[in-house]
């Protein structure tokens, strides 16, 4: 059974739980690595590109703004992943994020 385990990859779904805080993201990345995960997964979106919805009036848009990963933060997180020795992975919500994420 153990020889088949090498075919599996464990992904830590960090998402946006870091709330835009790079220090917190770094702690989560290290915990993911220490837990045996192969990937630390995040989410990239631009609040200005979100469609209008109930989140515009219930406080969620402000939360999304706080948790948004711009190019600089994404690059920092990517570098932390490299330093820790875990693969970086992200879900991208629109084509503008594809442009800069694909370049890191």
Language model: regions and residue ranges:
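Hydrophobic faces of well-ordered beta-strands that scaffold small-molecule active sites
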Residues: 10-14, 40-42, 88-91
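Conserved, mostly hydrophobic/aromatic
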Residues: 13, 32, 101
